[in-house]
């Protein structure tokens, strides 16, 4: 159930170039039960920036009432958020959206989790939940260069983990699809989050597979009221049918929406 709460900053640190790990504490964490959901953050106490920032939920610890977000500080809003210090309060709205369907993966099956850039974080909580139910996980994490690689070791603790960098400075040179080809990776179910180009490449390969993708989209309200994040349905070539990424997604079955 969505709530709004002022949450306490437990810790914040830069873990890669311009990539920040922010841990917040509050009872709102008890509502975070679907990996792949996100929160809407008010990054400053004043009027500017006006709009909240959508950030995915990376890790949930309900015993401590803490959750972790990873985000890239690149615009005014996220750069402001990066200045928040331990003990300060952050206005959080969430959890929002529909997450990854963990129930679609069965014990004994192999799940392939593919993340690109800042689309990697929501896959971490998903991976933990899949492992807990007896699913074998394989991770492929794609980044531009070694300076922005993060959480490789954490994913490796859960299952086989491969990294691709576009410039070849770490792991496989190229894209996540190059890793799949190079290692002949097979799987029963696919979960992915990242840039559209990556999602399109995966959709082109795996239309017949059970697969789910999470879209990264700019949002206004985050609750389905402003229609700023709509995407069209593949089944309607007229373009008149659509779904909202914030409330109907951000996770969709592969082949449902136009990428």
UniProtKB/Swiss-Prot annotation:
Question: To which protein family does this belong?
Answer: Belongs to the PyrK family.
Report a single Gene Ontology molecular function: metal ion binding
One Pfam family from the record:
NAD_binding_1
Q: Does this UniProt record's set of keywords contain Metal-binding?
A: yes
Q: Which domain of life is it from?
A: Bacteria
Q: Where does FAD bind?
A: 53-56, 70-72, 77-78
Write the protein's name.
Dihydroorotate dehydrogenase B (NAD(+)), electron transfer subunit
Supply the InterPro entries for this chain: Cyt_c3_hydrogenase_gsu (IPR012165), Dihydroorotate_DH_ele_sf (IPR037117), Dihydroorotate_DH_Fe-S-bd (IPR019480), Dihydroorotate_DHASE_ETsu (IPR023455), FAD-bd_FR_type (IPR017927), FNR_nucleotide-bd (IPR039261), OxRdtase_FAD/NAD-bd (IPR001433), PyrK_electron_transfer (IPR050353)
| Oligomeric and partner information | Heterotetramer of 2 PyrK and 2 PyrD type B subunits.
Instruction: Enumerate the spans annotated as FAD-binding FR-type domain.
Output: 2-102
Alphabetically ordered keywords of this record: 2Fe-2S, Electron transport, FAD, Flavoprotein, Iron, Iron-sulfur, Metal-binding, Pyrimidine biosynthesis, Transport
Entry binding sites for [2Fe-2S] cluster: 221, 226, 229, 246
The root-end lineage is:
Bacteria, Bacillati, Bacillota, Bacilli, Bacillales
